[in-house]
Curated annotation (Swiss-Prot):
Gene Ontology CC terms: cytosol
Swiss-Prot/TrEMBL domain comment: The IMP cyclohydrolase activity resides in the N-terminal region.
Similarity comment: Belongs to the PurH family.
Catalytic activity field: (6R)-10-formyltetrahydrofolate + 5-amino-1-(5-phospho-beta-D-ribosyl)imidazole-4-carboxamide = 5-formamido-1-(5-phospho-D-ribosyl)imidazole-4-carboxamide + (6S)-5,6,7,8-tetrahydrofolate; IMP + H2O = 5-formamido-1-(5-phospho-D-ribosyl)imidazole-4-carboxamide
Stored Gene3D superfamilies: 3.40.140.20, Methylglyoxal synthase-like domain
Keywords: Hydrolase, Multifunctional enzyme, Purine biosynthesis, Transferase
Pathway: Purine metabolism; IMP biosynthesis via de novo pathway; 5-formamido-1-(5-phospho-D-ribosyl)imidazole-4-carboxamide from 5-amino-1-(5-phospho-D-ribosyl)imidazole-4-carboxamide (10-formyl THF route): step 1/1; Purine metabolism; IMP biosynthesis via de novo pathway; IMP from 5-formamido-1-(5-phospho-D-ribosyl)imidazole-4-carboxamide: step 1/1
Pfam families: AICARFT_IMPCHas, MGS
Domain (MGS-like) ranges: 6-151
InterPro entries assigned: AICAR_Tfase_dup_dom_sf (IPR024051), Cytidine_deaminase-like (IPR016193), MGS-like_dom (IPR011607), MGS-like_dom_sf (IPR036914), PurH-like (IPR002695)
MF term (GO), any: phosphoribosylaminoimidazolecarboxamide formyltransferase activity
Protein's UniProt name: Bifunctional purine biosynthesis protein PurH
Length: 535
């Protein structure tokens, strides 16, 4: 068993980096500690020009760089120095004049940045595939018992601190080794993903008209948390986040207080946050079992998120119990007090949490309070995944959304201005309700949500029941459906409960029949031409 606390000093280091962030300071610290530095190409020039003593690898090996820099470090004096086992390979190393290299600081050619540039062609992409770098990284990682490998600039300071007290422990070197293999795995995966999108059936291979989906799919996620259990207590679970952070989300949120997030907390909070992101004006979304059970939008001058919370809660006070609450504005103390005084809540999430709100919620120690940061108005494109037994379904994110200008009026009566506001609001909510989804709304407040039914008509019936149970008036409300109505019965039922306007994708074989039903009832109906199934 290796002693994890024994420190090994560093006498010789090899530095060769593409990303030169912090490398000068790191090299200067190594030099002050008496470490001999070997370096290559641009890194060597940077160090030399800034007064850091370094030996160029070509001078050290006696073998000049060649093939436009393709061959620099691929030499026995380099890899023997990295891979040589101290106490086992000393004799053969001495015989061939190979000196041990105790630390390797390497990061790789910027392949991702290169292929992200407009007009990047295949030869350019290929030239930015690093060979010597990954080889050194893997060699040093394999021999981490004797060698420290550093691929992240964020580790430089910790390494220097360790060297100042006698060297790096095995535990430190093991952690650096793991980071190194994660680094090369992500790098190789990125290359395979990119090359796997090129159409091999064409006579000339080109990066033009690449497929959206690679032949094999590689992605890297980092474990953020091990959970007590999964969706159910008999299931084990962990939460992994994308290695490269994107827009504000549940994966980037900071937990300010409360119990550890559960598997279901994460899933439900994601649903709530993604829904509330859809709104520009102050909004509140309450979610239970990944379905919105109450949503409202209220302009600042009419009460903002404080009023929006009241209206969202009023939609379904029973389902809101133990729910997740999301806002698209800073959570203030008054709104926080209204929540904790009124109901049991699992999670509250907002882009920012005021100190007053933190002080209020602190009295409820179990409430999970999350701050996720601001998000851009434009939603980032990306992929969504759904696991099936033995496979993975991959699709582009459903970031499609409509405005009033996109609506196609298909009935004799056009919707009023207020109805249009409510229709667009209800449509945004319906996108986040499990199919079949029906949403009743009035004055930009949900008054009934029917979710997850096999029959669209039954979802509509549930929405009406929810509204009646909450004491909310359906008469004059609008209705949103995430997919088209296959028969007129959905409209007939809407007319019976007092729905005044309907928004739906359209596209049914019986659209004419459905439109006729709306006209008979004096209902205004608009088509979006866009479906929002959610399973």
């Amino acid at each position: 068993m290796t002693d994890q606390t024994t420190r090994l000093p560093v006498r010789r280091a090899l530095i060769s980096v593409s990303d030169k962030t912090g490398i000068l300071e790191f090299a200067r610290e190594l030099q002050q500690l008496g470490v001999e530095i070997l370096s290559t190409g641009g890194t060597y020039k940077l160090l030399k020009d800034n007064g850091v003593n370094a030996v160029e690898v070509a001078d050290y090996t006696g073998f000049a760089e060649m093939m436009d820099g393709r061959v620099k470090t691929l030499h026995p004096k380099i890899h023997g120095g990295i891979l040589g086992r101290r106490g086992t390979d000393d004799a053969i190393m001495n015989e061939h004049g190979i000196k041990p290299i105790d630390l390797v600081a390497v990061n790789l050619y910027p392949f991702e940045a290169t292929i992200s540039k407009p007009g990047c062609d295949l030869p350019t992409a290929i030239e930015n595939i690093d060979i010597g770098g990954p080889t050194m990284v893997r060699s040093a990682a394999k021999n981490h018992k004797d060698v420290a490998i550093v691929v992240n600039a964020s580790d430089y300071a910790g390494i220097v601190e360790g060297l100042k007290v006698g060297g790096l422990t095995y535990a430190q070197r093991f952690d650096l080794m793991l980071k190194a293999f994660e680094h090369t795995a992500a790098y190789d995966g990125m290359i395979a993903n990119y090359m796997g999108t090129i159409d091999q059936a064409k006579d000339t291979l080109s990066t033009a008209d690449r497929s959206e989906f690679p032949r094999t799919f590689n992605s890297q996620f980092v474990k953020a948390q091990e959970m007590r259990y999964g969706e159910n207590p008999h299931q084990s679970a962990a939460f992994y986040v994308e290695a490269k952070k994107g827009e504000a989300s549940i994966s980037t949120a900071i937990q300010l207080q409360g119990k550890e997030l559960s598997f279901n907390n994460v899933a439900d909070t994601d649903a709530a946050l993604e829904c509330v992101k859809s709104f520009v004006k102050p909004a509140c979304v309450i979610v239970k079992h990944a379905n919105p059970c109450g949503v409202a939008v209220v302009p600042e001058e009419e009460g903002g998120i404080r009023k929006a919370y009241d209206l969202a809660y009023a939609t379904d006070t029973e389902s809101a119990f133990g729910g997740i609450i999301a806002f698209n504005r800073e959570l203030d103390g008054e709104t926080a007090k209204a929540i904790v005084d009124r109901q049991f809540v699992e999670v509250i999430i907002a882009p920012k949490i005021s100190q007053a709100a933190r002080d209020v919620v602190a009295a409820k120690q179990n409430v999970r309070l999350l701050e996720c940061g601001e998000w851009p108005a434009e939603r980032a494109a990306g992929w969504d995944f759904k696991r099936v037994n033995g496979g993975l379904l991959v699709q582009s994110r459903d970031i499609g959304m409509i405005t009033a200008d996109d609506l196609k009026i298909v009935t004799k009566r056009a919707p009023t201005e207020q109805e249009i506001h409510d229709l667009v609001f209800a449509w945004k909510v319906a996108k986040f309700v499990k199919s079949n989804a029906i949403v009743y709304a009035k004055q930009r407040q949900t008054i009934g949500v029917g979710a997850g039914q096999m029959s669209r008509v039954n979802s509509a019936r549930i929405a009406a029941i929810k509204a009646e149970h909450a004491g909310l008036q359906v008469q004059g409300a609008v209705m949103a459906s995430d997919a088209f109505f296959p028969f007129r019965d959905g409209i007939d039922n809407a007319a019976k409960v007092g729905i005044s306007a309907v928004i739906q994708p359209g596209g049914s074989m019986r659209d004419a029949e459905v439109i006729a039903a709306a006209d008979e009832a004096g209902i205004a109906m608009v088509f979006t031409g866009m479906r929002h199934f959610r399973h």
